[in-house]
A protein has these predicted regions:
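Sec-dependent signal peptide recognition
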Residues: 4-10
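C-terminal motif of bacterial Sec signal peptides marking the signal peptidase cleavage site
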Residues: 16-17
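N-terminal "domain-start" segment that seeds a small globular fold
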Residues: 26-65, 85
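Loop/turn elements at helix/coil->beta-strand transitions in domains of secreted/extracellular proteins
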Residues: 68-72, 98-103, 131-136, 166-167, ...
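Amphipathic alpha-helical repeat scaffolds
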Residues: 76-80
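Structural microenvironment flanking redox-active thiols in thiol-disulfide oxidoreductases
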Residues: 83-149
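Thiol-/selenol-based redox modules, centered on thioredoxin-like
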Residues: 150-153, 157-201
Length: 201
């Protein structure tokens, strides 16, 4: 019986280890994220937007509070992804609602199989020439895990979910409430997203 018990022990050990590994990978360490407690509050700006970010292919740094009093759709993007075509719908969405206190914020990232250019000038050129992107785009950065930029760390902290791929979308109300993330599979011009945006305008 001893060999049988030992075999059962090994099976249980490896099963639990694999299960824990899968759980950890799905969790993406979101619970370990910490809000930026050192940030000076900006009057009238929701805390979720109070982050300094560098503009794409530029030395200019802005605070996302520049977009306070707007409904915000924050998206992690990439130029060489199977979902890159969603840029077209994102730009159309921006053009439709930008006059109604709505903005899209794009955050290029190489987190997922390095599907973004390493050179920000290439990212900018691609977005402009291929899709005519005019919504704000920011510096290439990490959007998941402990190396994520502070904005996406806080999105993960609030929602309990980091991006699991490119083109994950976070909708934020004018008062700073973050709605549940929309996955890459939900198109920007889907009725689900459009209805959610219109309910906040």
């Amino acid at each position: 019986l001893r060999p049988m018990r030992f075999a059962l022990f090994l099976f249980s050990f490896f099963f639990l280890a694999c299960s824990q590994g899968n759980a950890d990978s799905k969790n993406l360490n979101a619970i370990n994220f910490q809000p930026d407690l050192n940030k000076v509050p900006v009057e009238g700006c929701p805390a979720i937007l109070n982050h300094n970010v560098r503009v794409l292919d530029s030395k200019d740094v802005i605070n996302l509070c520049d977009h306070k009093d707007k409904v915000v759709l924050a998206v992690n993007v990439a130029s060489r992804c199977g979902f890159t075509y969603q840029y077209e719908a994102l730009q159309s969405l921006f053009e439709t609602y930008q006059g109604k206190d709505f903005v899209i914020l794009g955050f290029p990232s190489r987190d997922f199989m390095f599907q973004e250019y390493s050179d920000e000038s290439q990212v900018k050129e691609f977005c402009n020439s291929k899709y005519g992107v005019t919504f704000p785009m920011f510096a290439t950065s990490s959007v998941r895990g402990k190396k994520a930029n502070s904005f996406f760390q806080n999105l993960a902290l609030i929602t309990g979910k980091s991006p699991d791929w490119n083109f994950t979308k976070y909708l934020i109300s004018k008062d700073g409430e973050v709605l549940k993330p929309f996955s890459k599979n939900i198109e920007p011009d889907s009725q689900e997203i459009i209805s959610a945006i219109e309910s906040l305008l």
